Regions:
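Short, disulfide-bonded extracellular cysteine-rich repeat modules
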Residues: 148-154
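Switch- and interface-adjacent substructures of P-loop NTPase systems
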Residues: 1-96, 101, 106-147, 161-171, ...
Length: 175
């Protein structure tokens, strides 16, 4: 699904790639491989186009820049498969964890689950966007710290549906 977003005179093509069926099999061994391969393939294809001597004036960017990783609000911790997949994905793309269907939780349940997830991310050394980077200057570190605080404190709405049409209701999800 593609959509053009324009804000402050800047046009951006937003491409949404869904991965239906991920982790739904009886044997989920290496179920993340097709996702990671797709992300890497998109980056490689863009780089090949960029490095050609006679490159096109406009190269459509099909790279995956961000992964919204929806975590089921089970009331427990992350599933073992989620931990493995988050590690694999964070090596190739910016990962933003989102609590799926969080509007079905009370404020207290949502906060407790969010804290549990943050603890698990720290325990398993999972990377969450924005990343800490030794090469950043002080201003960039401060900006990244503020982004991280905003992501953890605020509750921005995220539209989540299989299709953004009038036939599918859009549920609210909260970071």
């Amino acid at each position: 699904v593609s959509h053009i977003i324009e804000e402050n005179g800047v046009r951006l093509r937003l491409n949404i790639v869904d991965t239906p069926g991920y982790g739904d099999q009886v044997n989920n061994d290496r179920c993340w491989d097709p996702i990671v391969k797709y992300i890497k393939d998109q980056h490689s294809a863009y780089l090949r186009k960029e490095l050609t001597a006679q490159r096109e004036r406009y190269i459509q960017d099909t790279r995956i820049h961000c992964c919204l990783f929806f975590i089921q609000p089970s009331g427990h911790a992350l599933k073992p498969i989620d931990i493995v997949v988050l590690k694999k994905l964070s090596d190739v793309v910016n990962v933003v964890p989102v609590i799926a269907k969080s509007d079905s939780l009370t404020l207290e349940e949502r906060q407790a689950f969010k804290e549990r997830i943050k603890e698990e991310f720290a325990f398993h050394n999972l990377k969450m966007y924005p990343y800490d980077n030794d090469e950043l200057d002080e201003e960039e570190r401060a900006l990244n710290a503020q982004i991280k605080v905003n992501l953890l404190r605020r509750k921005p709405e995220v539209a989540c549906a299989n299709d953004f049409t009038e036939h599918h209701p859009i549920r609210r999800c909260w970071l």
